[in-house]
């Protein structure tokens, strides 16, 4: 979810597989990625700073990214991936789960791959909690107060 611009992203494993996006109210639904770039998209991650959408493809065994509108698709990691299940991002790094390991690499180049955890017990998902991962926007209360002020004036 990209709350600041009110967009929702999701994967569809249908035939053909695709990554889609829509407004939070369901309107303006668009297919962003389909065809040769996609087989089994298992997880998505949004990089708020570079405005990129990352995904793992379990069949193609790659991690790719694109601009938030689906343009400029690029492979970031395409070697050594066996059974990926989750991806997340923080600062200049991406982190992903593959089999029972958690990996880290440069999110721009895919280089400097490091194993952070070698024998995790059945990891399924991966999250990083940090204030930088929570983009600041107008709070609902602020919008509500501004609406009241506008109505009263």
Regions found by a protein language model. Name each.
Residues 23-27, 67-71, 106-110:
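Short loop/turn segments that connect beta-strands within beta-propeller blades
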Residues 90-93, 97-148:
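Blade-level signature of beta-propeller repeat domains, shared across WD40, Kelch, NHL, RCC1
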Residues 4, 15, 40, 59, ...:
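Beta-rich catalytic cores
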Residues 4-6, 49-51, 91-92, 131:
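Short coil/turn segments that connect the beta-strands within blades of beta-propeller domains
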Residues 1, 44-46, 86-87, 126-127:
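Hydrophobic core register within WD40 beta-propeller blades
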Residues 13-14, 49, 58, 99, ...:
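Short loop/turn segments immediately following the C-termini of beta-strands
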Residues 9-11, 54-55, 96-98, 104:
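Residue position within the beta-strands of beta-propeller blades
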């Amino acid at each position: 979810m990209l709350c600041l611009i009110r967009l929702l992203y999701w994967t569809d494993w249908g035939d053909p597989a695709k990554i889609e996006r829509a407004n939070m109210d369901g309107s303006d639904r668009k297919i962003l990625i389909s065809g040769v770039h996609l087989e089994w998209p298992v997880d998505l991650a949004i990089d708020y700073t570079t405005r990129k959408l990352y995904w793992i493809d379990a069949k193609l065994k790659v991690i790719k990214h694109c601009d938030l509108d689906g343009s400029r698709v690029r492979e970031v990691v395409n070697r050594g991936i066996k059974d990926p299940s989750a991806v997340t991002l923080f600062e200049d790094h991406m982190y992903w789960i593959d089999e029972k390991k958690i990996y880290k690499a440069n999110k721009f180049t895919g280089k400097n791959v490091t194993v952070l955890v070698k024998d995790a017990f059945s990891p399924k998902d991966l999250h990083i909690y940090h204030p930088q991962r929570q983009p600041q926007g107008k709070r609902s209360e602020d919008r509500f107060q501004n609406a009241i002020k506008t109505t009263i004036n």
